[in-house]
């Protein structure tokens, strides 16, 4: 028995010795596992660029190991392709890729969710692994990449695996790179800033608009968000159909490099496309949704271009100041010479008499109130207290009570002026105290300043919020820029679009200076009791001109605010003061020959508020709602008729609930009972043409329902303004009045500059009417100084055209300064 025990100990001694030695405990386990492994298992040293096929199930899992080496200064990436013929969504093939610091996993078929619970399945998936960076200190970096393929399918799922190295992972500068992507096969590449480049523009182009895609720029960090549901989690991104462009600055990337990610969306809804018709629930979509892309990264402009472009903008508009100063000096020299020669005021007004003389045979007896005694007309006559029915006052006395506004109802009460005279002259409609009327027109100026302050401050706050949201979220679909020519500065994404509005501010201020000079000269003439300032020419009331200058400046400010982040929500920032400018110009034209019966500032600005409200409603509801266009067209036509009635009857036709009954009576008596010639033929012709134009606009909108309602409304205002201005100039020439060289030059300059401005306006570099991706299809390169685009040139030219337009209104009747007011016809 003892011998048997000794024999057993001797047999077990080698095993005990091996167990006591460290490191020998795992060896039998490893050998045992190796014995249990399938000899065909490819996990033992898998190769790149080789296709591996296999079947995985609940009891079978395959692991592949790849040895990847990264060298200093060389960035390479690995891409994993997995394809599965299994369409069972309950038991997909699960792929897990393990790297040194990262884990990436997905399933095949890959499932994407769309709108309204729609799903899209992709049975071929390719993903790029986040590259590991080798440094000079560590030398070549070797790492193992494990690809684990598994499935919970009870009967097995077939798959194919291919792992490749990306040869062209780093994008070059100024070289186009072509590639293909799909929703389940996203792509991303690396870009490093060159040493001499501070900013770059990523330009992406595709020949076909769809499928919709997303271009994203992300910092060098893992994981890289390259799927539809997570691409918006990091970095800067924008949707794309045919074009995309992102401007980046080196200072925003600490490592001076970034990833450019390209993701194809499973649906085109975000880009303005229609829904795909999914015939088979488990259909493979890769072939249908692949997209060929071309990416080019080019250096952006340098800081010197910013400085040069800014100085260019300032000097261009400062030249207008120099030109106006030169004109003032020339005018001053000529005035001094005339004063020395004694020739000023020597004109007797011949040739300035109106062609439309009073026809006494056709007027009722005793209706010669306000008629002209031509034998006494002389520009050299002295002041008469009975002339014009008012004494002369100096404007130095500013103590005018508010009640004074309604203390002179001559025009309202003396119906003979309106009802019995066939031909009116300016003296008939300039009978109120000049100080009171001037105060009335100054309300336009003070009210527009109040409106501008209360309007601009919340606008600025809102656009700053928009810009902050864009910078924080990286969502460049919020703002509709021309991304191919959007140059950032500080927190602003498109500084060039803001700088180009400087012209409105500078030229608006210059116009205010010109009006102020004229105002001061006129006040001095009144203080000196100059006969020409008191009884000759168009009565000088500068309140509307001041309001026009402020409106021009505010148009520049609000246009700049709009271009901080132009989009669907803030379009009215840019258009509201355009309506006001057009309206003020029409009011000024009417006030020129009707100084005592013009609209009050309160009713005028209230009308502008109604117009802006209608514009907002039109943009919101006017795209598809027929009922809105019916209501708007009815309002448009009725407003045109009401305004025409007021203009024709010089404000004597009251607008109240009985207007329709009175209008029917007038129509019956004047047009049906006895068809008589209109009393005011010229006015009637203008109003008929104006109504035809406005009714045409109304029916055009009702039939075609234009999508850009804001531009449609602005077109109505501009056409009415041009029509009224053309009528005014024609009637002025028809009345044998002269047009001096300065207004002729301003008219010609206005026509030329407006034509050029409209050419650039209709280039349509972006549009918030569609999706951001559709808007980017219209983007174009810069055309001026590599800094300004076509829309910036529109800003320059439109500011200049508005300035010349204002000068036309300011100087058009300068020839009447030596003509008696009772010889200036009203039209």
Curated annotation (Swiss-Prot):
GO terms for cellular component: membrane. Residues 398-409 have a biased composition (Acidic residues). It is a multi-pass membrane protein. Residues 1-19 form the signal peptide. GO terms for molecular function: double-stranded RNA binding. Residues 20-309, 464-494, 563-572, 622-626, 705-710, 763-791 are extracellular. Its main location: membrane. In vitro binds long double-stranded RNA (dsRNA) (500 and 700 base pairs), but not dsRNA shorter than 300 bp. Not involved in RNA autophagy, a process in which RNA is directly imported into lysosomes in an ATP-dependent manner, and degraded. This is SID1 transmembrane family member 1. The gene is Sidt1.
């Amino acid at each position: 028995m003892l011998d048997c025990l000794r024999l057993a100990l001797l047999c077990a001694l080698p095993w005990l010795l091996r167990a006591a030695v460290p490191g020998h405990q795992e060896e039998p386990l490893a050998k045992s596992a190796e014995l249990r492994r399938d000899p065909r298992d490819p996990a033992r040293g898998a190769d790149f660029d080789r296709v591996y096929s296999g079947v995985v199930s609940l009891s079978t899992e395959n692991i592949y190991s790849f040895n990847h080496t990264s060298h200093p200064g060389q960035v390479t990436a690995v891409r994993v392709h997995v394809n599965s013929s299994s369409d069972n969504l309950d038991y997909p093939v699960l792929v897990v890729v393990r790297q040194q610091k990262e884990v990436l996993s997905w399933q095949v078929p890959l499932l994407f969710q769309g709108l309204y619970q729609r799903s899209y399945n992709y049975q071929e998936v390719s993903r790029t692994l986040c590259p590991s960076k080798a440094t000079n200190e560590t030398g070549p970096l070797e790492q193992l990449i494990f690809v684990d393929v598994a499935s919970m399918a009870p009967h097995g799922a077939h798959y194919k695996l291919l792992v490749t190295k990306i040869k062209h992972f780093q994008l070059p500068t100024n070289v186009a790179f072509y590639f293909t992507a799909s929703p389940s096969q996203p792509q991303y590449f690396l870009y490093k800033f060159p040493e001499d480049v501070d900013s770059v523009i990523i330009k992406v182009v595709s020949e076909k608009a769809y499928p919709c895609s997303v271009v994203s720029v992300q910092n060098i960090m893992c994981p890289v968000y390259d799927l539809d549901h997570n691409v918006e989690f990091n970095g800067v991104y924008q949707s794309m159909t045919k074009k995309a462009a992102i401007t980046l600055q080196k200072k925003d990337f600490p490592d001076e490099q970034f990833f450019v990610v390209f993701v194809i969306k499973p649906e085109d809804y975000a880009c303005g496309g229609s829904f795909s018709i999914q015939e088979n629930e488990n259909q493979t979509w890769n072939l249908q949704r692949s997209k060929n892309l071309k990416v080019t990264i080019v250096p952006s402009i340098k800081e010197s271009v910013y400085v040069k472009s800014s100085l260019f903008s300032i000097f261009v508009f400062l030249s207008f100041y120099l030109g106006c100063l030169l004109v003032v000096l020339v005018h001053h020299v000529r005035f001094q010479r005339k004063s020395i020669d004694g020739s000023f005021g020597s004109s007797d007004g011949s040739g300035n008499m109106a062609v439309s003389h009073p026809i006494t045979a056709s007027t009722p007896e005793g209706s010669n109130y306000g008629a002209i005694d031509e034998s006494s007309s002389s520009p050299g006559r002295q002041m008469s207290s009975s002339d014009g029915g008012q004494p002369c006052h100096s404007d130095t006395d500013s103590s005018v009570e508010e009640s004074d506004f309604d203390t002179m109802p001559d025009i309202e009460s003396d119906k003979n002026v309106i009802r019995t005279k066939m031909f009116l002259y300016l003296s008939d409609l300039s009978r109120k105290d000049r100080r009171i009327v001037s105060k009335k027109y100054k309300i336009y100026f003070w009210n527009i300043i109040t409106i501008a302050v209360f309007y601009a401050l919340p606008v600025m706050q809102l656009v700053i919020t928009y810009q902050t949201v864009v910078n924080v979220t990286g969502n460049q679909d919020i703002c509709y820029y021309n991304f191919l020519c959007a140059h950032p500065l500080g927190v602003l994404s498109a500084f060039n679009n803001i700088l180009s509005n400087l012209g409105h501010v500078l030229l608006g201020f210059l116009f205010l200076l010109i009006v102020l000079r004229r105002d001061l000269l006129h006040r001095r003439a009144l203080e000196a009791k100059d006969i020409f300032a008191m009884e000759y020419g168009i009565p000088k009331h500068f309140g509307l001109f001041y309001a026009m200058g402020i409106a021009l400046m505010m148009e520049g400010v609000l246009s700049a605010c709009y271009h901080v982040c132009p989009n669907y929500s803030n379009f009215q920032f840019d258009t509201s003061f355009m309506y006001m400018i057009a309206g003020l110009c029409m009011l000024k034209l009417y006030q020129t020959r009707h100084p005592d019966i013009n609209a009050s500032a309160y009713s005028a600005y209230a009308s502008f508020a109604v117009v802006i409200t209608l514009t907002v409603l039109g943009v919101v509801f006017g795209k598809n709602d027929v009922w809105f266009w019916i209501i708007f067209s009815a309002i448009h036509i009725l407003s045109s008729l009401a305004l025409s009635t007021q203009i024709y009857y010089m404000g004597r036709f009251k607008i109240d609930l009985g207007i329709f009954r009175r209008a029917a009576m007038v129509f019956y008596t004047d047009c049906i009972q006895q068809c008589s010639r209109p009393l005011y033929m010229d006015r009637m012709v203008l109003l008929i043409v104006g109504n035809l134009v406005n009714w045409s606009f109304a029916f055009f909108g009702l039939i075609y329902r234009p999508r850009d309602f804001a531009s449609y409304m602005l077109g109505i205002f501009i056409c009415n303004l041009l029509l009224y201005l053309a009528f005014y100039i024609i009637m002025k020439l028809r009345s044998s009045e002269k047009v001096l060289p300065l207004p002729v030059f301003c008219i010609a300059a206005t026509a030329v500059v407006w034509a050029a401005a409209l050419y650039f306006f209709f280039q349509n570099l972006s549009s918030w009417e569609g999706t951001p991706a559709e808007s980017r299809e219209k983007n174009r390169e810069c055309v001026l100084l590599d800094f300004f685009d076509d829309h910036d040139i529109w800003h320059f030219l439109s500011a200049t055209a508005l300035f010349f337009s204002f000068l036309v209104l300011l100087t058009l009747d300068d020839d009447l300064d030596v003509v008696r007011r009772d010889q200036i016809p009203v039209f």
